[in-house]
Amino acid sequence: MIRSAAVVLLSGLIFINTTCAQTPATSMARPEATATAEFNGMVDRYFDGYFHFHPTEATYAGFHQYDGELENFSQKSRDAELSFLLEAKQGAGYAHTDLLNEEQRIDLKLISNAINARILELQEIRMWQKNPDIYSSSGTSSVYLLMSRNFAPAADRLKSVIAREQQIPANLRDAKVNLKNPPAVYTEIALEQLPGIISFFQKDVPDAFKSVTDAQLLTQFKASNDAVITALGQYQNFLKQDLLPISKGDYRLGPDLYRKKLLYDDMVEMPLDRLLQIGYDDLHKNQAELKRVAAQIDPGKTPEQILAALEEDHPKPDQLLQSFRDTFNSLTGFLRDKEIITIPSDIRPIVQETPPFARALSSASMETPGPYETKATEAFFNVTLPEPSWTAEKTKSWMEGFNRGTILSTAIHEAYPGHYEQFLWAKQYPSKTRKLIASGTNVEGWAHYTEQMMLDQGYGGGDPKLRIGQLQDALLRDARYIAGIEMHTGKMTLAQATQFFVKEGHQTPAVAEREAQRGTSDPTYLVYTLGKLQIMKLRADYKQKVGASFSLQQFHDEFMKQGMAPIPIVRRIMLGNDSPAL
């Protein structure tokens, strides 16, 4: 899915009304169907252009004509993309929407916002100038997508890997030109990531293509792969020796850029001080509920003591995959029995051990195919089991991360009725634009909303141990919400944010450090809680609108049908007005 889209809307289709009005004969020959065809053609050309600049996203979406291309970080490429974007923005401003139906006007709004978001990134936020990790990690992600799904024979996918690998050294050279005084935390994170990235190319990429027997192809692959490993090693030395000592930049966006980013990505227009107060209100509500539930479990222990004890309740490693399968079965049965949401397909995600080449990247992950993937259409839920070589202490610590409460919250958020459920509805999304442009407040807001909603509807039989785990996860998202705003508006330092996650978010120091660091480069990770609150308000407003005929299943189904658009757009469709999302 695309969080922000960019490229050119070709002027011949942007000026739909101008073209239609040239002569009476032309006007008569332009019925609504013709205007629709022209608009759809514009959308197709828009995404073709977008994927030219972002081929990794094209591979995920299922457009494999871009599999041999890689993102280009040169000044020339940046200038070309910006030129297209500015032309597109000018054209969109002259578009006459009177010939478009409501669905098309919504799509035009989504595309216009995506153009503005990408221009903001290139011209003002400028992560290409500040974040060393994007250069080393982008190539990894691009190659990983070619490895992880069998949409073509292994030899064909390896040819695309070679083509992409041949472009990675140039990107790393461009990084040395582009990077100007990055924040120290960005350079430090990039250095922390690089050993794993180098290992990925040394071991995981070759392992993924062991079945290929073409000697000439394997020789080409060894050359391209060795060149990437060498270039990454040189980049690592550059970061450590040259860039880190001068990394004294500021990661903060500042209030103005923060507001713009929220507006273009998620259509949030609320003043930041009011937005922040909403976050604190939700934090305090969840903190009070955590204390109440903890006292219900054991009044003699603190919430932290209870949460620590709950980590001991986990399956054995050889039972972990089955535990997730059983949880999926239980969740889908509950959803159907209680008529909470329609499950469009009986096809389940395949629960499997994380493939060897991805084990270093994730503990658990849901991998769904893109909306236009026609070959590798399976979805995989990957779970990383402890390595046989690990010590007993390390294995114990790892399995504590898969305690019963975590298994449930992960299964709800990632699968039913969270991300996988939303994926199952994708075929019903009303347009190409709605399939390809996604809002974080919708996607992550929905998945987070379902964690609480399922327990509210009675899943787990009111077990307070499940509720306290759900509340800890909610407090983590509340802390993200607040820390993101306050760090990027200069009200909270990185160290203060770390302590905030511990003290107010009830997280361990290790989790707190990782979460605070994430917030420096993911400033709007408030979308989890923000989207959840927006969906809860939409549900209340929708219930008021339809009255006694309200059905939770009907509400959820209608929400799913709208795609992954920002909540204000979903509200407009479901409520018929532009009332406030919060």
Regions from the language model: what does each represent?
Residues 22-582:
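N-terminal maturation segment of proteins
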Residues 1-2:
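N-terminal secretory signal peptides that target proteins for export/translocation
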Residues 5-17:
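Bacterial N-terminal signal peptides
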